[in-house]
């Protein structure tokens, strides 16, 4: 053949190198399919210890290969994209599928809207593009425009997962469906609430029913019908306190929610503790050259011994700053003053902090034996109290006899757990009340020792509200119990197993342990060093009355000399802050900057997303002048 002859193949094979490619199939672009998954990591994008062992042994890999406590490294073969080399190199409109999936929903929506296709490509892609564009629009409407399309489901918050499910339903034409939503506004900035509520109302207009569990005031006011359950929590709740429209509840004196709607908490917007950054008396943390993830901040100041709220629209960089910059660098520098910084070029003022603690919503206690009484540290005092009774001393019982973790005093049948595990063969195991001790955890002899007519088993079954009065004469026990009451946990029992507590309950119990250390009631000397606390949305799951309690508790920590930094969207909390740091102006690549900072009143004067909603909020919550 002539030297300039070129050979082409109709069978997706290269005549020069011999490479043969399979026919393009939708499964080729799915990492859940063996056809599309990276052969090295089996479509996980990461290599864990279990996966490495399976590879060495030549075993098949399943979902159990991804354990939370294992070390993970990004798969070098696919670079974390999860796909095989063929799928990674197919381009459409100039982009590969990993490049498209790395976009946020907002970026992808813009890219798909502005595609320039020839007539043939448009004819082929029109139906698919219509579906893609509408689904991306739905994600934006429920406030998830900042999420990347490749985001792994386990990394999503509960609120984000719920809103993704909601977005998927917006694209259907179903009628007569009853949707149940549990706090869909979690993690949403108040500005974005309106979009979410509009999306919810669209579902109702299609002929569907929505039952929404919610504490957000705006959501409650937009509801067609409200059912108020109360009046308290635990055994003090469960009763219908009122139902009807907002006006019906506001006129109902028995409705706790109605009272809060009719008489909102007053806020002046003026902080309790003034912040003047040029005041030489004020100690501060100053970060310069912050560049973590989407953050691009020249300088950001956090006043110490103040209550600071970091706010901003979803995806603006709040968690990145508080966790990956502030918390991470303080933790490093408090261990080693010369430790390298991450995500920031310079940090000054860290020497004024004694310790840093993230009070998060992870479960407390390592096993089911942990309970509120053991976690806050009063169980030891309770055991000592029972060991000091005449009956215990006459029998020769010491404090260990009153521990359900010790065989000498624990029920021999359930080993001090109060529950027995019943194996169900092919079904999950079931826990049932122990018949021997009736759930009291102790053996009969130990339960015969009484203090004020109650056994130690009876004490563990007490609600905290009852226990406050019962132990009123014992300050070392009563004080932490009163603190638990103050943070709205009075309905918990002292012996409630820790795994049954919600994330919000666990977070508030952690706050109680810190308050118990600083002894802010004046009757005990402070024991804790200057601590900086970082909290991420502590108001999740709280009723409006409990939010007020929480705000007062956080202020008590600051009054005791600590620093509190809170990531929060709740406007009641923001209005009570000494200092607000507002990040934005949008989420993702359009965020990451300080758009406003100052007192609530100062931020409310700005035309930022937070400033606009805070201005309206303060106007609606002005204190009523007494005549």
Predicted region positions:
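Conserved phosphate-binding elements of NTP-dependent enzyme cores
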Residues: 1-627
